[in-house]
Regions:
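Active-site hotspot residues in diverse enzymes, especially metal/ion-binding acidic/histidine motifs
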Residues: 1-360
Length: 360
């Protein structure tokens, strides 16, 4: 295996890289053994390497890199031992999500941050953005925070045509990739002095995409310190509802009556699920508790709680792909070199960070 004696793996990065692939140490050892031409690699060896009790360099570094499908320099980068500040990571997840899957998502988020930073540094992009923290309390509600942010970002009244474009224009980093779980739609992280990062699950239903993203936006602007998880989740939902469906504008569409047919009609206009529209109608007093529950029962009977009718295209981030395009056009890098900057093999890099204009 090709390696370099000048490179030494960072123990915490070995752990982060492994967890981003969803592997245990035994899984890692098995994959390394498969690639090592008959030489057995034990779980104990992987454990010692991740604990920093032995030096990983040269051919052994190359073996780790081949197994993990990252470049050797990627495994030598420094990062926080915990990957990301877990208390400042927010996500929309189901209660059924296991600890191993959640660790994988957190590790993927941290690795994605490193990859995006490498791409932006090469493109000399900087960290400018228009996000700020907005405090909420008994007087200033999540809905107030959403209204404030809409005004500051110059959004017109009514529905938002493209939420991804709005966030990227404000300086956010958005990446869509397969998070290997159906229990989580999105996760976000905003370290001090850096751009907010939103990682979106490519397997999440398209009609949940925008609400999940707006939910994470709410976390980012309102929750800069750890707090009560249940309360913060409710606040993020309230923020998302007002940000995507401002009360005055959506009331005009809901007051004529709310039934399944009306929800189907309004779904593409507001870019949210029928379920989200029904919740909004209830929160604004258009539907009583009994009417809301009856509507949910009807939706369940028709299978709409699993797959709703009326689909629309998922919004696609473009900023990082455009940076890759500029690296190719202005800095004369080919895609393989750009992938190496991000620490990825070409196929995975192209899938995550490239758009049609960047692969021509």
């Amino acid at each position: 295996m090709e390696g370099s004696d000048n490179l030494v793996a960072h123990p915490a990065m070995l752990t982060l890289a492994r967890e981003s692939r969803g592997w245990t140490q035994s899984d890692m050892a098995a994959e390394m053994t498969r690639l090592a031409d008959g030489e057995a690699v034990s779980q104990g060896y992987v454990s010692r390497a991740e604990a920093g009790r032995l030096v990983v360099k040269g051919d052994r570094l190359g073996l780790f890199a081949s197994a993990l499908r990252y470049t050797p320099p990627m495994l030598c980068r420094t990062t926080d031992s915990g990957g990301v500040g877990i208390g400042l990571v927010h996500h929309r997840k189901r209660a059924s999500m296991g600890a191993l899957s959640l660790r994988r998502v957190h590790a993927t988020l941290a690795v994605t941050r490193l990859q995006a930073e490498a791409i932006m540094t090469a493109g000399r992009e900087g960290d400018k953005h228009r996000f700020r923290h907005i405090a909420v309390d008994d007087l200033d509600t999540p809905a107030d925070a959403a209204e404030t942010l809409r005004l500051e970002w110059g959004l017109r009244a009514g529905s938002i045509a493209n939420l991804v474009e709005v966030l990227e224009a404000a300086g956010a980093l958005l990446v869509v990739r397969d998070l290997q779980t159906r229990d989580l739609d999105a996760v976000s992280h905003w370290p001090q002095g850096q751009r907010p990062l939103f990682l979106l699950n490519s397997t999440a239903p398209g009609d949940r995409f925008r609400f999940s993203l707006a939910h994470e936006l709410g976390h980012s602007v309102m929750h800069n310190v750890p707090g009560d998880a249940r309360s913060q989740e409710q606040q993020a939902d309230q923020f998302a509802a007002e940000f995507l469906m401002p009360h005055e504008a959506v009331l005009a569409d809901l007051q004529s009556g709310v039934d399944l047919r009306r929800l189907m009609e309004l779904k593409p206009k507001w870019g949210v699920s029928m379920a989200a529209l029904a919740r909004r109608a209830k929160s604004l007093g258009v539907l009583s508790d009994w009417q809301y529950r009856s509507l949910l029962v009807e939706m369940s009977a028709l299978g709409y709680r699993t797959i709703e009718p009326v689909t629309f295209e998922r919004e696609t981030p473009h900023y990082l792909a455009e940076v890759v395009t500029r690296l190719r056009q202005q800095h004369h890098l080919d895609l393989s070199q750009a992938a190496h900057l991000a620490g990825l093999e070409l196929e995975e890099f192209t899938e995550i960070y490239s758009c049609p204009s960047s692969v021509r």
